[in-house]
UniProtKB/Swiss-Prot annotation:
Pfam families: DUF134. It comes from the Archaea. SUPFAM superfamilies: Sigma3 and sigma4 domains of RNA polymerase sigma factors (SSF88659). This is UPF0251 protein PH0803. Belongs to the UPF0251 family.
Length: 110
């Protein structure tokens, strides 16, 4: 077993390149929903960046992967998760908070 790969550790996550961190990181409904409050939805910078590059900038998943330093498959998973979270936020009227995971390299190019 290679050094640093102890039991239960799994594979180390690659660093992700984030070119434009979100300017607004917390979204919430203007009118609270009826009933008990639901927990907020958490979106990662990786999911946000994949959504921004593919749906907003119009890049292919392969191009987005190159920009982020990850595989096209990882972009696909992040994009699918981000789209589901945005839909869930809109349909259920829940808060959405965008947070870093700690494995991002933020390169703000404003």
């Amino acid at each position: 077993m290679p050094f640093g790969w102890g039991r239960g550790r799994g594979r180390r996550r690659k660093m992700r390149m984030i070119r434009f961190p979100p300017q607004v990181r917390h979204f919430y409904p203007a009118i609270p929903s009826v009933g008990p409050p639901k927990p907020p939805i958490i979106m990662t910078y990786e999911e946000f960046e994949a959504l921004r590059l593919v749906d907003y900038e119009g890049l292919t998943q392969e191009e987005a992967g190159r920009r982020m330093g990850i595989s096209r498959g990882t972009v696909w998973r992040a994009l699918t998760s981000a789209r589901k979270k945005v839909a869930q936020m809109l349909v259920e009227g829940r808060e959405l908070i965008i947070l870093p995971q700690g494995n991002e390299i933020v390169r703000d190019e404003k």
